[in-house]
A protein has these predicted regions:
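Membrane-targeting and insertion segments and their boundary/processing signals
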Residues: 8, 12, 16, 70-77
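Glycine-rich NAD(P)-binding loop of the Rossmann-fold in SDR/ketoreductase-type enzymes
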Residues: 2, 21, 33
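NAD(P)-cofactor binding segment of oxidoreductase domains
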Residues: 1-15, 37, 41, 105-108
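Oxidoreductase cofactor-interface core, primarily capturing Rossmann-like NAD(P)-dependent enzymes
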Residues: 25-126
């Protein structure tokens, strides 16, 4: 949040943040709770425009050490994605490149408000 405060003080009117599907400040899961608390903190700062991207599992090449749980999830993603329909579509995996393209598409959008973008919306923005 310190970087966001600094950006706001420097005159930024829009903030775009990558959070996570399932983010909620009251979640029992530490990761999702931290993401939710961060979202709430950003809302409280009062940017004219706040875009919160909530991707599922990010797919693509990564630098750094490989985590076992993440490796298992990446291997299982194609099968899991095929089974996730309807309201569960938001839990599907998504390429990191798609999320990056959505960010570029959102940058500079002057319409005020807080917008939540899940996988399907990010895919539309990236096209």
């Amino acid at each position: 949040l310190a970087a966001a405060r600094g950006a706001l003080m420097a005159g930024a009117t829009q903030m775009i943040v990558v959070s996570s599907v399932g983010a909620a400040a009251k979640s029992r899961n530490f990761y999702l709770r931290t993401k939710g608390e961060t979202e709430d903190g950003l809302r409280a700062l009062g940017f004219e425009r706040l875009d919160i991207l909530r991707p599922g599992l990010l797919m693509g090449d990564r630098a750094g050490p490989k985590r076992m749980g993440e490796g298992i999830a990446i291997a299982a993603a194609p099968l899991a994605d095929a089974l996730l329909h309807g309201s569960l579509r938001r839990y599907r995996s998504i390429p990191g490149e798609t999320v990056a393209r959505a960010i570029v598409a959102l940058a500079g959008n002057a319409q005020p408000g807080v917008r939540i973008h899940e996988n399907d919306a990010m895919r539309r923005l990236a096209d």
